[in-house]
Amino acid sequence: MQWNKSGFLVPAPGSPPGASFAQHCPFSPEAPNEDAIAGELFPAAPFADARIGRFEAAYVGHASEQPFRPNGSSGGLTSWVAAELLRTGVVDAVAHVAPTDPESGRHFAYRLSCSLEELNAGAKSRYYPVELSQVLGEIRATPGRYAVVGIPCFIKAIHLLKRVDPVIGDRVTHTLGLFCGHMKSAAMVESFAWQLGTELARVQALDYRIKNESRPANWYRTHLDLAGGGSAEQDWWHLADGDWGAGFLQNPACDWCDDVVAETADIAFGDAWVEPYSSDGRGTNVVIVRTPKLKALIERGRADGRLILEPVSADFIVKTQAAGLRHRRDGLAYRLSWHRSGIRAVKRVTPSAALPLRRKLVYRLRYAIARWSHPMLRLARACRNRAIYTLWARSALRLYQSVAWSRGRFGRLLDALLPPPERLS
């Protein structure tokens, strides 16, 4: 795999896909969808919901056992479950994303952790392009039982690969999913560095979400460690491209995904983006458990007092992810209705343009921002003038927020002409 011009990892030239590629690419129209895969994996699940899939139980809460909650971006439950699988001998190693030396050309990468110390060093959210080829090679080379942590499309890809690769099928025994809004380009790090008054080459490490117990959990703040011992940090909302919902530097594939909550994972974790949890700076998870064995593991943690969890309904989970689900349901249906040449995505959402005009404008603007942010950043880099990108991004953000949030004079004018959209965040 190698970087493309937009900061995404793509197959290197001379690496043609194999004959079975169309059957195990998660975005291929020829591959089974999430419903089909989950139906095979969790046939006896007592609950099935069109929005969050099949499941055994759902919870909201956090890990009370140290150091999982303080070390994580949210409630610490992803790391706790991965650690519990390791220390009870259920798996021999966990494949997860961890920081790496930027001299390698990447700030984060998948690795295999065989100890709790290694696992804890990889805690926290990483909105950075990664790929699985190296760890899959290590799994093929070393017999054992492995858990894989990943976003929905990665977990789906693992299950599709298990169908055609018997070694992976035998050795990957557990999948831990992460809820996903969309993924960002590696260029996001460069943009943040520019806006914090430094250069990408000086960034030695970064934290996309610093945890501060005195601030609401949804007040994202990024932190950069710089060469020479310095650092820089800033709240996302002060950054030109810091509005997550606007889609700056988004991976194009994310506009054609309909799985927010990792419906094919054995267990999946997200942030509890509803009050009172979103105001709790310590972080709170929502969890969807899809297998009886992992439900038993969770219940043992609750009984021991190591987990503080309350059972919740599918409707509660949906409320915590309302914005992402709208974008992957109503928004995806609208995008699927557009005329496009080439391969057309086949999704579980029916194409439809039956939306109010104002909401159509919101989705069109998100799509345009996601597409144009990449060439604008490249232009700024080529001209050695970061203002080309940041001024464009701030202008695009003002237009987007006027349409989506009725902000500014133009937003008020639009309100007089068109009913404001449902709050989309």
Please report, for each region that a protein language model flagged, where it lies by residue:
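Non-heme iron-sulfur electron-transfer modules
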Residues: 1-62, 109, 274-277
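N-terminal, charge-rich interaction modules
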Residues: 59-82, 89-94, 357-370
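Short, conserved secondary-structure transition motifs
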Residues: 179-191, 211-215
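Local cysteine-cluster metal-coordination motifs and their immediate loop/turn environment
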Residues: 1, 19-29, 151-157, 249-262
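Long, compositionally biased charged/polar accessory segments in the mid-to-C-terminal portions
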Residues: 91-92, 201-425
